[in-house]
């Protein structure tokens, strides 16, 4: 009897001290606060704040959802956070000033853009070791990877190029010139195209992944706004490859683009200085980080209307959502 009571007591204590689990938790990096805000995507309410390293920017969740990776840019490291306990449990050797990164489809390799050193650092996530350092253009930032994991794309902001890198040899195999200050690279789900945003150029270049040539350039025009105020940054493409969302920076809008015709269909007004985007796993919402209004916006992907804005920390930048 005493043994049974002891087991029940231990179970009760474990229940009390265990962290609550939120379905499809949204993680937002706040670069001024040095925090990550967790939002429950079902209730669209913030539930917890985690203290992290200095100037957090890039953020992503491991494929199994057990760990959160955060670029602590001014600490020159990538921090590892346990998504069950929300404690920092380790770090990865990222190289100096990690800005953005991308995880391989199998979740085993992390590719990190090191803006200060003009490098892409390749990290074995499990072993926590550097596999390679790849020299790229000046001020690398945007990172994308093909669905088959064979090709990684890095954008260099000052060189104005998209570098296509073979993930086996870790060699650059193609350089594609794009417009000024490319900030993000996103593959279509079928791997046929890479979309590269140009913040100062005001365009998104659509690159054919087979020929490594720009096949189309998407430009944006918003009544009442100067062209210089429209600065494309984050890009996301729906799972069916039919629609894309582009964050337009100080234009305070997200552009909705037909990903088959490349026509802009709508501009969605969100918070101030929109940076990055992420889909919920079910694809029902795309979430924007709004840096100067210190909030995020949930956008319904059926109506392409904003549903709710949620206050987070100071200067939200990156966003990711835990898988189902």
Language-model features: locations:
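Predominantly soluble domains enriched in secretory-pathway, periplasmic, or organellar proteins
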Residues: 12, 16-324
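Bacterial N-terminal signal peptides that target proteins for export
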Residues: 1-9
């Amino acid at each position: 009897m005493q043994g049974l009571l002891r087991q029940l007591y231990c179970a009760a204590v474990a229940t009390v001290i265990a962290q609550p689990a939120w379905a499809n938790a949204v993680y937002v990096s706040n670069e001024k606060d040095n925090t990550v805000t967790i939002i429950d995507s079902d209730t669209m309410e913030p539930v917890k704040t985690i203290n992290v390293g200095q100037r957090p920017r890039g953020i992503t969740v491991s494929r199994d959802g057990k760990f959160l990776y955060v670029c602590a840019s001014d600490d020159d490291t990538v921090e590892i956070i346990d998504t069950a306990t929300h404690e920092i449990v380790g770090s990865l050797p990222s190289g100096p000033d990690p800005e953005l990164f991308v995880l391989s489809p199998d979740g085993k390799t992390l590719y990190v853009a090191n803006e200060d050193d003009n490098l892409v650092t390749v990290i074995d996530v499990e072993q926590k070791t550097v596999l390679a350092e790849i020299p790229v253009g000046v001020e690398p930032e945007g990172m994308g990877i093909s669905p088959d994991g064979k090709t990684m794309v890095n954008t260099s902001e000052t060189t104005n190029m998209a570098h296509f890198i073979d993930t086996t040899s870790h060699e650059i195999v193609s350089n594609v010139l794009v417009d000024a200050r490319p900030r993000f690279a996103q593959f279509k789900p079928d791997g046929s195209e890479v979309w590269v945003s140009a913040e100062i150029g005001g365009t998104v270049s659509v690159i054919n992944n087979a020929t490594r040539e720009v096949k189309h350039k998407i430009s944006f025009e918003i009544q009442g706004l100067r062209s210089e105020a429209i600065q494309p940054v984050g890009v996301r493409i729906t799972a069916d490859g039919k629609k894309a969302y582009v964050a337009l920076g100080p234009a305070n809008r997200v552009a909705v683009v037909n990903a088959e015709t490349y026509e802009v269909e709508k501009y969605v007004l969100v918070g101030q200085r929109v940076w990055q985007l992420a889909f919920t796993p079910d694809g029902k919402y795309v979430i924007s980080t709004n840096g100067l209004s210190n909030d995020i916006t949930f956008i319904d992907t059926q109506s392409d209307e904003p549903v709710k804005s949620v206050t987070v920390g100071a200067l939200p930048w990156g966003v990711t959502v835990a898988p189902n």
